[in-house]
Every structure is written in structure tokens, then in C-alpha cells.
């Protein structure tokens, strides 16, 4: 890559600022199955190299995460695409059922939004106007696994709502139920209006280039990024709060790609709205088993006492919001009991911080 000032940078693989664009997670696997043979790529995403990912981006890179277009084909597809027609509010449930079925079959290329939860992307009417959204969904079956994911999608909605109402930037969400299926509609923050785009870089991509920790906690990585000027100091403070809140509500899925940063003019980056925030300790196990307990929270010293106190209040607000709901399944009751005890025990520890 050659910058405007003439400086040249070489990458052995995909540059760090392209890592989030490559097909990944649920949508990425579906994409590989659907388009792998057509593009001469392996049908299994796990077998892809950076060269394979780049080939996919050059062909279908007109609708991926962030604001970049790679190559003339992606640029032409973006410029020639007709204005998107938003899904009407009154037709969402039925339309989302159809889109979920297509996503499950791998029929829609969609965005490269990562994550293992089944999802699709679309453009839809919302109470605030038309928005690009990511829609997570449960399987249309009556079973323990689907029921648990339905509960967790509602919990995610309530967690993000708790953050937003406290003045913390968090993705705006809506829950839509249709028969046995639940949809969680999440507004995208890398899209502006019908065709506008915003740069977004995950903490994982930043870490790969500037830190190299691989698995460290968010607070450790963001402090190093703040010290080197890659992100704003207040972004590191906000990341600390999100990580502490997630710890207190049992979010065991706070890997480095579940936190992102945005910017209109490059470095230093500010923090993106929170997303993927749910008590994932209760997620179904790979073997189909169900968990209803939470490991004791560790009140790490790399987060300030003040931040822990604020996170504790947010966790209690989240718990109160959950307890007011009557639509969680009965089998989620033991989880709610464990969550209550977990937050109460952590609050006792936090109170000792002074």
C-alpha cells in the first residue's frame, strides 16, 4: 500500500484494515458453500487462504463491512446498484421468515458480518426511518436449543437497551416474533442512509497489527492502542466499561472481534456502538447441553474502581429490566436466578473497592 505522503507498506497477507471484510462466521460459511465452486474456491471456509478471501472480495466486495471497495468490479457493482427498497414495517415478519430460510440455504451473499449466530442483512423501515440492519434469528422449530437462543436474543436486546438509556453508545435493536421464530433486528453503524458507508475496524484487527496479544482482555489491548495513538483515550475508557458490564452479566463471548471502532478521518479511532452483548454463559453447548450457572466474576484491577461501580449499576438496571419481562421461557428461570446471584455477589465485591 502506498499512502498519500508516498510511504509504502507491505503486508505478507491481507492488510489489517481488510481483515474485517473477509467472509467469516455464519454468513461466511454460507457464502463459501454458495459461491466457492463458482469462484474456484474451497467449499469450506476453514480451507481459505488470504488469496481466496481477496478473490471473493474482488467479485462480491460491493456489500461488505466498512467503507472500502476493492477493484473495479466491486466499484461498478456498487455504483450501478439500484436504490434499496426498504422492507415495510407491516411486512417484516413474513419477509424475515423468507430471508432467514434463504440465509440458512446460503442463497444470499449478504454482508461479511461475522459471528456464529444465524443472521442475514437487509434494508428495512424502522421507527426512525429506513436503515441497513443485521437480523439474527432462531431456527423455526420448537426445541430446547431454539428456545434458549430466543431467550438470549431478547436478553441481548435488553442489554443494549440498558446501555443506550444510560447514555452509552449501543446498537439500536428491535425484537420481532413470528410463530416459533424470533428475530433480533440490529441497526448497522457502518452504514449511513441508503448508500452511505462508514469505516469500521474491529479490536481483533487492531490487535493483529499493533499489539499481537491474540486473546488478552479488552482493557489490556485498548490501553496499548490508546498509548500508541491508534484509538482515543476516551474510547479505551468506554471499552473498559463495556467489558466490565459484560463480565457482570455473564457475557463469556467478549473476544476481540466483538468490539469495534469507527472514524471519519482515520486515526485516532473512536469506539463504535456496543453490539453482541448478552449473557452468553447460558448459550447452548456444542453437544446440545444447556447451562444455567455462571462462574464467579473476577473484578480485575486493570479496570478502574469507578468504572466497576458504574458497570455494577448498569448490570443491576439490566437485571431489573429482565425481571420485568414475562416472555422469557420457563426453562430460562434457573438462568435468571443464577444471574441475580451473580450480580449480587459481584456488587458486594465492588462495594469493597470504596
Question: In which residue ranges do the predicted regions lie?
Answer:
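Phosphate/dinucleotide-binding and metal-coordinating scaffold of catalytic cores
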Residues: 1-354
Amino acid at each position: 500500500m502506498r499512502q498519500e505522503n508516498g510511504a509504502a507498506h507491505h503486508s505478507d497477507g491481507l492488510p489489517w484494515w481488510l481483515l474485517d471484510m473477509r467472509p467469516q462466521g455464519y454468513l461466511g460459511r454460507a457464502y463459501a458453500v454458495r459461491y466457492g465452486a463458482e469462484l474456484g474456491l474451497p467449499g469450506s471456509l476453514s480451507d481459505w487462504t488470504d488469496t481466496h478471501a481477496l478473490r471473493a472480495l474482488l467479485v462480491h466486495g460491493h456489500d461488505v463491512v466498512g467503507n472500502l471497495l476493492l477493484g473495479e468490479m466491486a466499484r461498478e457493482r456498487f455504483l450501478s446498484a439500484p436504490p434499496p427498497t426498504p422492507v415495510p414495517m407491516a411486512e417484516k415478519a413474513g419477509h424475515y421468515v423468507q430471508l432467514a430460510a434463504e440465509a440458512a440455504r446460503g442463497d444470499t451473499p449478504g454482508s461479511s458480518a461475522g459471528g456464529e449466530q444465524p443472521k442475514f442483512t437487509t434494508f428495512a423501515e424502522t421507527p426512525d426511518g429506513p436503515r441497513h440492519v443485521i437480523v439474527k434469528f432462531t431456527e423455526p422449530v420448537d426445541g430446547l436449543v431454539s428456545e434458549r437462543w430466543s431467550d438470549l436474543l431478547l436478553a441481548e436486546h435488553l442489554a443494549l437497551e440498558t446501555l443506550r438509556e444510560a447514555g452509552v453508545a449501543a446498537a439500536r435493536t428491535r425484537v420481532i416474533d413470528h410463530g416459533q421464530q424470533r428475530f433480533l433486528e440490529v441497526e448497522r453503524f457502518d452504514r449511513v442512509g441508503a448508500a452511505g458507508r462508514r469505516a469500521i475496524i474491529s479490536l481483533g484487527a487492531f490487535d493483529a497489527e499493533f499489539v499481537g496479544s491474540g486473546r488478552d482482555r479488552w482493557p489490556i489491548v485498548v490501553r496499548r492502542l490508546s498509548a500508541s495513538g491508534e484509538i482515543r483515550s476516551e474510547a479505551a475508557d468506554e471499552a473498559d466499561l463495556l467489558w466490565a458490564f459484560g463480565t457482570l452479566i455473564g457475557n463469556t463471548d467478549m473476544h476481540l472481534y466483538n468490539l469495534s471502532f469507527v472514524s471519519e478521518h482515520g486515526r485516532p479511532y473512536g469506539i463504535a456502538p456496543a453490539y453482541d452483548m448478552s449473557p452468553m454463559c447460558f448459550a447452548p453447548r456444542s453437544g446440545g447441553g444447556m447451562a444455567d450457572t455462571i462462574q464467579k466474576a473476577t473484578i480485575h484491577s486493570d479496570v478502574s474502581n469507578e468504572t466497576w461501580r458504574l458497570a455494577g449499576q448498569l448490570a443491576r438496571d439490566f437485571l431489573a429490566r429482565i425481571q420485568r419481562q414475562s416472555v422469557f421461557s420457563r426453562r430460562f428461570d434457573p438462568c435468571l436466578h443464577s444471574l441475580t446471584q451473580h450480580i449480587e455477589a459481584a456488587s458486594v465485591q465492588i462495594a469493597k473497592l470504596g
